[in-house]
Every structure is written in C-alpha cells, then in structure tokens.
Amino acid sequence: WRMLWEHNSTIVVMLTKLREMGRDKCHQYWPAERSARYQYFVVDPMSEYSMHQYILREFKVTDARDGQSRTVRQFQFTDWPEQGVPKSGEGFIDFIGQVHKTKEQFGQEGPITI
C-alpha cells in the first residue's frame, strides 16, 4: 500500500486467482470485509463487482499520518487458465480496455501497478 501511495498508483491489475487446482497462487493482500491497517495506511473495502471474466474491487486508502485518502481500484482477471492461454483473447482485450478506460475516467497520474 505504501508503494501505491508513494507512486500515486490508483489502479492495480492482478492476473491470477488466489487458488488454482487446490494450490495457493497469490496471497490475499487486501482486506475483504473490514478495514485493515498496514503500517501508516488504513485500507477500507468499499465495493466489489464480479464481472464475467474479472473482479473489480474499490478501496479507500487513507494515510493515517495526515488523513489524506485516495480510491484504489483493483482489477483481477479471473479467466486465465493455470496452464496455457485463454481460448480466446477477446476477454483479455476487453479487460485491458476497461482498465485503460477507468484510468482515463478518473484521471490517474501515476502508473498502473501489475
């Protein structure tokens, strides 16, 4: 969260599921239901939208030192198989398009974090 804050990154792209074929693939680094504090940053989950091929989560991230806050949006692509590639690239292209559309819509100045 500190890296996102320092680089003014308000969009995170995640390309894996948490578990696949019974194995952990990624640690859940975000709070699911209640706010959590990570050093100086309080992360409040605001919303979660499940789409056909991805999940969009929105968080309010507050710097506890000065009270400033930002909205961070996490896009998790869920249609990528553990082995190989998706049957069609269309869903992934749509996903990337939505990420860029969101960046333009909300005027993010910092980089997209992957």
Curated annotation (Swiss-Prot):
Pfam families for this protein: Y_phosphatase
EC number, as in UniProt: 3.1.3.48
Span of domain Tyrosine-protein phosphatase: 1-114
EC supergroup of this enzyme: hydrolase
Domain of life: Eukaryota
One function term, GO molecular function aspect: protein tyrosine phosphatase activity
InterPro entries, sorted: Prot-tyrosine_phosphatase-like (IPR029021), Protein-Tyr_Phosphatase (IPR050348), PTP_cat (IPR000242)
PROSITE patterns: TYR_PHOSPHATASE_PTP
Gene3D superfamilies the UniProt entry points to: Protein tyrosine phosphatase superfamily (3.90.190.10)
Binding annotation for substrate: E82
Keywords annotated in UniProt: Hydrolase, Protein phosphatase
Catalytic activity field: O-phospho-L-tyrosyl-[protein] + H2O = L-tyrosyl-[protein] + phosphate
Cited SMART domains: PTPc (SM00194)
PANTHER family: RECEPTOR-TYPE TYROSINE-PROTEIN PHOSPHATASE (PTHR19134), TYROSINE-PROTEIN PHOSPHATASE 1 (PTHR19134:SF449)
Family per record: Belongs to the protein-tyrosine phosphatase family.
Protein's name in the database: Tyrosine-protein phosphatase 13
Organism, as annotated: Styela plicata (Wrinkled sea squirt)
Taxonomic classification: Eukaryota, Metazoa, Chordata, Tunicata, Ascidiacea
